[in-house]
Amino acid sequence: TCALPISAKGGSEALFSTSLPATCFPNGSSLACSWDVELVHQMGQALGRECQHMGVGILLGPGINIRRTPLAGRGYEYYAEDPVVSGDIAAALINGLQQEGVGASLKHFAANNSEYRRTEMDSIIEERALREIYLAGFQRAITKSQPWTVMSSYNRLNGVQTSQDPFLLTQVLRDEWGYDGLV
């Protein structure tokens, strides 16, 4: 016999039998190891075609959090500890995806360092480290690809919830980088 999982809300979204067939592409960590932006661009195009086929208008990704530890719960999803590699790989995926008419949602902006209690955690980071490590990949991806959306992270950054942070969302993202997409 097989026990099927039921969500805490009683819905069917957790049932494996309700999912649709889809291609299993390599995870973010594997993609970054290739350093092959053309291959990642082609993968973005393939993802875009699958999304179009399934009626998906915006893909909730890529995620480019900095991989601080291999033990992070979703660390496999993120590209690297290097913001240049992360930004370049993300831009390639985004450009391929959006070339097929499907938007990307670059996430989690910014300094989302843990999955454990991430809505309660506060990432305390000096501005220089924030800009050189945690924001540089986002800036690079946004400059090279203009994703349709940017998803804020769930944590606080230096005491301010990132989804309400005027420094992060207005000063940096909008004013300094010129991003005009949806947040």
Each model region followed by its residue ranges:
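Glycoside hydrolase catalytic-domain context in secreted enzymes
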Residues: 1-183
